[in-house]
Amino acid sequence: MDKRLERILPRVQKPARYVGGEYNAILKNKDEVDTRIAFCFPDTYEIGMSNLGMRILYGVMNDLPGVWCERVFAPWGDMEEELRKADMPLFALESGDPITDFHIVAFSVGYEMAFPAILNMLDLAHIPLHAADRTGLTPLVIAGGTAMYNAEPLAAFIDLVSLGEGEDVTVELIELHRRARREGWSKPDFLRAAAQLPGIYVPSLYDVTYHEDGTVASITPRDGAPAVVTKRIVHDMDKSYFPVKTIVPSTEIVQDRVTLELFRGCIRGCRFCQAGYVYRPVRNRSRDLCADYCVRSCDDTGYQEVTLSSLSTSDYPPLTDLCDELEPFCDARHVSLSLPSLRADNFSMELMQRLAKGRKTGLTFAPEAGTQRLRDVINKNVTLDDLLLSCRTAFAGGYSAVKLYFMLGLPTETDEDVLGIADVAARVMHAWRESAQNKQRGIRITVSTSWFVPKPHTAFQWEPQISKEEYERRVALLREAIKTKTVTYNWHDSDTSFMEAVLARGDRRMGKVLETAWRKGAHLDAWEEYFSLDRWLEAFDECGLDPHFYANRTRSEDELLPWSMISSGVTQAYLKRERHQAYRSVTTPDCRTHCNGCGANLLVGGTCDV
């Protein structure tokens, strides 16, 4: 261990974040590898170590002969201060080596508010921020993750972007980079070659111009770059890598358990949900393989909790059969199964009984909207009766805590829709009174609202975010309507949601705002204790840009969007059609009921009904 680090660790919170050495961490002999990759997560250890994508790609890269992938996380504020005072560069956990020793620096970016942390980590690593200032092949700075479906705010800082699922394209990119170093290519030569790999977007190979009103006028590829870059996906989940031997952290993390991915994609088509669109099409992992991964993961980690994870886990066709198959193992090993947020329209007593064998920590449902009209607008395809039936089932089975998630500011939302949230909570309370086994335990209902953030590649990508003042008015309206002590109301901070909306649909000009805000102290802005909206507003003012232009403006469907060179596989025509359906409160059936012609099946060689 570096002597400077030994002196620093006693002075920071949770020093285990920075020492590595965890069970199942991968160590290699530096003399036996030719490619070193610093796999960076622009948030803290506790968040990054919980990320399944990080676990998967860590294993994929380390399975390659001659490649050593090591982890790097954003330091907490106290650690950053100590690193800067000691002039100690940011380092990787496995070897403790500075990031400048690595050939590739790869960021996994799932949240726009992590953008400042990327700049901060580069600076802490003593790596030039701007891609144009990094003239050599190493270190190559790349990024992937769902937030990179609009990478334009980071275009000046990132050499290239990997779009979609990274298991295959990451291997191809590493091999190309090896070849480039071996044959002495220049960086421009490498980037031009990388742009020919499906799923690789090289921002520097696209020239962007703007109209006088600030909208994008043109996006012009050059040097043979494709006009549109389409995401990569895994075709066969049974042949894809799964991290059975995952790292067991040495300190508590957010998701400290086995995360078992049952399938990718989502059949539902909620119109606000970026993940639901960009992870299409649906691809299931076989039941037997899921069961095998569950058993082996518990054996290799010692975990006694397994989360059955997907965008909509209860839509996994053999879910009940999988639980049946795992029951003897779980009983013998005292392993509990848990599910994330549940669909209210397919929750059953049978499923609940299997979950009840573990810890009854409460159930979570996400109705998203307070009235059926608005649920139809967003294509939630869940009714109040569905929700109440599920709650009655849970209460009859002994559950006494329910969390309900909603959004405020959805397109077409009215005060009636807002007040409908309070009515839903009251109806759930009534369902408990009707169905609870033991009323002496009482009931805990938690209503949580977030501020709707329009995202690229969704049916609502053209919609405005409501103003901060209007959001806070609706929060106050709902708070006043929820008067019972048995219902707790939590709402999301408005300032961070506003900046998320700005960054999510930002263009390249946002890069100078991002850098200015970072220089003013925006480092860990995914955390409310570090976030300052005033800092960002000052940066916008200094750069001559208006944040409301990005967050609060309705876009014309004819407008060239900043991310128009990126395709998730879902066509723009389909997104427009879904938007028009939303304004008529017309729902679209799920993908298993009927193919709606979104285009995503073409990615796996299938057909789409138009």
Regions found by a protein language model. Name each.
Residues A74-P221, A459-D507, E515-E529:
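Glycine-rich beta-alpha loop elements in corrinoid/cobalamin-binding modules
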Residues M54, A86, L122, A156-V161, ...:
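Short secondary-structure boundary/capping segments
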Residues N51, E252-D288, H594-V610:
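Canonical Radical SAM [4Fe-4S] cluster-binding loop centered on the CxxxCxxC motif
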Residues M1-D31, I37-F39, T484-V610:
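Radical SAM enzyme core and accessory elements
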Residues C40, M113, V295-K403, M407-T446, ...:
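Conserved SAM/AdoMet-binding glycine-rich loop
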Residues A193-P203, L311-Y316, P340-N346, G409, ...:
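A glycine-rich phosphate-binding loop feature that marks nucleotide/adenosyl-phosphate handling sites
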Residues F39-D43, M61, V248-Q274, C298, ...:
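N-terminal pre-triad scaffold of radical SAM enzymes
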Residues I8-A38, Y45-E46, P203, T209-T259, ...:
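N-terminal [4Fe-4S]-dependent radical SAM core
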